[in-house]
Amino acid sequence: MEGSFQFNKSKQTNNNSSLDSNNIINDNINNNLNFENNNNNNNNNNNNNNNNNNNNNNNNTNNNNTTNDTSKTSANSTSTEDDEEDILGNRKKDTTGSRVLPMDTSLTGAAEPSKKRKNTQDDSEVEVQYHPQKRASFSLNISPTQLQNDLSLNIFNVSNSNNNNNSNNNNNNNNNNNNNNNKINNNSNLILNSSVDSTTSSNNNNNKNSNDNQQPQQQPEEIEGELNRERQERDKMLHEEAEIEQYKYGDGEEGENYEIMVTPHHRTSFGHITSANSDETTNNESGSPINSRKMVTDEEDPHSSHNEDHQSDQDNHGQFMNDEHQSTDDDQNKSDNEKESESARNSGDLQQKVHNSKDESTVSTPQHIFNNGNGEGEEEDDDDEEYDVPLRIQTVANNKSTKLSLSNCWLKVIPTDVWSILELRDLDLSANQLKKVSKSIGLLVHLKRLRLNHNQLTALPKELYSLPRLTTLYLNNNNFKVVPKEINRLTSLKTLDLSFNQITDISPQTNLHQMTNLVELRLRYNQLSSLPQNMLESNHLQVLWLEGNRLPLNKAILKKSPSEILSFLRGYKPPNKKVNDKVINKAHVNPALPPIDTASTIAVAQVFAQKELDTKKRKKENLDDFKKQHIETELKLKQLEEELQIANAKATKFEEEASLLQQQFNNPNTPTGPSLNLPSILLNQPHLGWDQQQQQQQQQSPNVSTPPISTSPVLTGGQQVVNGISQISLLSPTQQINNPPSPVTQFNQASPQHNNNQQQQQQQQQQQQQQQQQQQQQQQQQQQQQQQQQQQQQQQQQQQQNGSPQQPHVNNNNNNNIQQNKDHQFPVPTIPAKIIEVEKPFEWEVPLSEIAIGARIGRGGYGQVFRGSWRGTEVAVKMLFNDNVNLKLISDLRKEVDLLCKLRHPNIVLFMGACTEPSSPCIVTEYLSRGSLANILLDESIEMDWGLRLQLGFDCARGMTYLHSRNPIIIHRDLKTDNLLVDDSWQVKVADFGLATVKSHTFAKTMCGTTGWVAPEVLAEEGYTEKADVYSYAIVLWELLTRLIPYAGKNTMQVVRSIDRGERLPMPAWCPPKYAALMNRCWETDPTHRPSFPEILPIMEGMISEFQKEKKESIAQGRPIPYVGPPEKDPSNKQPPQNMATTIQQQLAQQQPQQLLEQQILLQVQQQAQLQHLQQQLEQQQKLQQQLQQQIAHPNNPNNFYFQQQLQQQQFQQQLQQHQQHFQQQQQQQQQQQQQQQQQQQQQQQQLQQTGSPIDNRLNYNFNNSNNSDIQPMQQENNYRMNINDKK
């Protein structure tokens, strides 16, 4: 585009940019001046150019003062008169205070300590504390429709401001726009603090001599498109809450580190060119200078040291990274004209929204800008930031928001309340001090975006890899050394950033080629030297960043697509490492000498160090100073080795430098020609004497200027090499006993300090002895090499006989160097060969074939327990899981079993041996018949008084005291009632102790079943200590008290959450006070507040003695034994049985009333049946009487039947009366018999109580007789009735 949006690339523009920035700063500092005065001054300076060129744009035909008023009213056309008064009132208030930048009320709010941020997802306001390093967020309540309806108002921000300048000055050109853009780039907050009119005044002041170029008005369609694009980018910035640290740290998300990106002429996102010579005017998007670190101090930023470490590498790769990531930056996808137009319109658009937004809650500004640049109030901001964390979490939970940002909050542990927000989609935990991530992150199943960059993480929990919807994961700037193998379980992952870590290798088991959704992979600035073969087959990657590693990739290859980079690595073949012939020729050294590795260089240094040690001992120097120097130099040696390997991208560079040192050592008398260039790490040390060397060089050649500090000094002789490397690599004398002293005296011949004849003779003798020793060592090494060659030949012959392929043999670098340097005058000292110790046979090995395995009796977190027999002894065999068994695990297992089998204690399960075969590893222990304490406690049929339970807990404490008293300490790691076994004499023995190797190897499996017994610090993955066993012992005490399962009815996550919150198991009201106090002490959250097992023993012993005393007193006084348990199960409420006789008596007493009731009911039924039968007989007799009466009434009846029937009736009535009397007598007899039986039972009970003798058989006899006596009258009655019926 043309007009004011064009960019002027002339030198005059670059010179004006620095002046403009200074003028803008001065304008912002003196912004309290009146608006009309600034513009009037400009108009007075330009009286000759009034309103000549802007009649078409602004229709302003007034004089200078009226023009200023018109521009002011047009700039504030969207606001009311009341708003203008408020703005002017606030500006006046700002002028009364100290050097506070004046701002509108819609932007400042500096009087309030806490600002309000507008939520991006809803209209609710969120109070958020601001950290001093956070940038302001521009959240404006302007809808897209409002932007489209107010296009006429938006246009004047770009055009009217510049046109007013044309009307007043007639000199608004490209340089003006350039100044506007520079002002926007200098500080994002200055855009907010300055108004449209102050911008025009600065342009008028800075551009008096520029060319006259009139700006044409933009078309509404073009402006509408540009505004829509700017609005979308600004909404994206608001949604992601970009911070100033993003550009400083260089995490690669919204932008890269500008210290890397900036070149001598680099085009920024606003379209202007930054010069490499102007450090103060070159700024990034966040508003901070590139080469200045004034915004962030070392104390405020824990990551600044990391950026400084990589500064040299970043400078080398600056241009390269600019070219490589050109396709990923949004700004570089646009043309230059579009960038220029966007920058100009962006300034006007922001200014328009400054006037439109009057609510303080919509805009927030960092407070550190208003502290005069001296950092005042930063400590208060840090406190507010810590206080702000729970407020953010609570606000997100209340609003049901899907995004939570806790970045730059100095968190060491993630708050547990975060895991309760299950609706989270976006979680930002960057720029904290996190070392571990809780396993509860697996609860956030809806999480899509997770940022953990700029922390101290070394590993991730396995629950994180089960998140099904995670698409973006940032892990850059941490301490990862390997790529997690479980990362391929994140099937939805699209972006993965592992840059700026310490990754040295990517395992083939990672299977990154199977992650088809992964399109962006960032592995910058690690220590990768190769990639797995299956990763090279990945064809789904669209972005692959590999710069800053040790891969053989140059800039041209890194610019290519990921597929081309991977194809190049597939066909790459590493060349043979050779010494650079050019460097050797410059140093006048024999080019046939091969390079040496790190170990050989250190060996050379150690020889010099040993020689210096001997000379210092002869001089009897202070040993304390010597030890301090030893420690310092040992650290410097490690630093030398690490930094040389890390700083050099090529692996051969360090070897070349080491080779130069060796060559200088082997040829001390070489003529001084071109000097040797050594790394700066060797030479930037003030105590090494390099300054003296420089002084000598200056004395010899005064006209030659000394090199700067950044360049490495040079060494012209062997004495400086000796002094420098011996000072740095001074090692312990114990490590150098076998090393012979080095011929340092050869280098001392050239120095004027050693010219005595005696010293020369001593030196010659020492040289002869050293040469003899070295010759002997060479002979021994030659013999060893011959033996090795013979062994290799024998192995090759065996392989040829067996038909196996031959493997090429790789010689050691040290041996190669020694063999090739045999002909040289001064042989190279070497490191003594390591003696390989022959592994001793395992003493406690139990072959699996000798064990007869029976039924399974249990199952644990890392094995199954079987009952078995070994050599006639009943044993328990624990078969370990062999999922990932390797040789190291078997070796560690043997060491631990060797230690455990030597333990002997009555409260410890006896280890008898182990089978260490990789196919079936197992442990053999003694077998205890009663089983585990957990099964005994859950069996209600087994009665256990309080004294027995106290004794069981005391036995457990004794066993744990013994384990913790061993050296080294044996930590159980899984103490619970399932691992406490009971023998026949009710003695507890601790089982499954030790085996840290197996338990740590299967920690996840163990945690699944024993979460309720695990200490809080173990759940937080802070490691096991002996106090973790004390916490588990508290849960065991609770089980002994209640005989219940802890945390019954809760799943694992609920238990973990309750333990993290500090919740503990409920304490019953009937618990003894001393016992409850001990439990509360043992399950304290702070491990330091928990007692040790030696402290627990006397407490348990005191409670046992008190219970025994109470028990004896209660027995002597005839009272029941003291009971501790639920009141409903108290046996004292019931009469306890004394012996078997009383139990039988009680059973009979309960059975007899029931039998009597049944007999009475039967008698009543029988009597009713008899009465009914008699009534029927009476009715029949009445019928017969009626018939007889009828016969008597008739005279013709010849028989006297009436009298016969009357006699029979009388007889029948008599029999009936007799029967009734007999029935009554039987009832009376039964009652008497029952009374007699009751009397007999009472007498027997009294006799049993007095004598205690068992009941004789008389009870059964009487009982049978009573039953028979009841049955006989019934049979007699039935017989009598049958006789009567027969008679009838």
Swiss-Prot record:
Residue ranges that the Swiss-Prot or TrEMBL entry lists as coiled coil: 221-248
Protein name (database record): Probable serine/threonine-protein kinase drkD
Biased composition (Low complexity): 13-79, 156-220, 1257-1268
Record GO biological process: defense response to Gram-negative bacterium; negative regulation of cell motility; negative regulation of phagocytosis; protein modification process; response to folic acid; signal transduction
An MF annotation (GO) of this entry: ATP binding
Domain Protein kinase: 851-1104
Catalyzed reactions: L-seryl-[protein] + ATP = O-phospho-L-seryl-[protein] + ADP + H(+); L-threonyl-[protein] + ATP = O-phospho-L-threonyl-[protein] + ADP + H(+)
Gene expressing this chain: drkD
Composition bias type Polar residues, residue spans: 1-12, 271-291, 344-354, 701-717, 733-757, 1269-1282
Region (Disordered): 1-132, 156-223, 269-386, 690-717, 733-764, 796-825, 1118-1141, 1245-1288
Species of origin: Dictyostelium discoideum
Alphabetized CDD domains for the sequence: STKc_MAP3K-like
Ligand binding (ATP): 857-865, 878
GO cellular component: cytoplasm; cytosol; nucleus
EC numbers for this chain: 2.7.11.1
Entry-linked Pfam families: LRR_14, PK_Tyr_Ser-Thr
Keywords: ATP-binding, Coiled coil, Kinase, Leucine-rich repeat, Nucleotide-binding, Repeat, Serine/threonine-protein kinase, Transferase
Ranges of Acidic residues composition bias in the record: 376-386
Domain of life where this protein originates: Eukaryota
InterPro entries, A to Z: Kinase-like_dom_sf (IPR011009), Leu-rich_rpt (IPR001611), Leu-rich_rpt_typical-subtyp (IPR003591), LRR_dom_sf (IPR032675), LRR_R13L4/SHOC2-like (IPR055414), Prot_kinase_dom (IPR000719), Protein_kinase_ATP_BS (IPR017441), Ser-Thr/Tyr_kinase_cat_dom (IPR001245)
Residue spans of the LRR repeats: 400-421, 423-444, 446-468, 469-490, 492-513, 517-538, 540-561
Catalytic site: 974 (proton acceptor)
Compositionally biased intervals (Basic and acidic residues): 302-343
Family per record: Belongs to the protein kinase superfamily. TKL Ser/Thr protein kinase family.
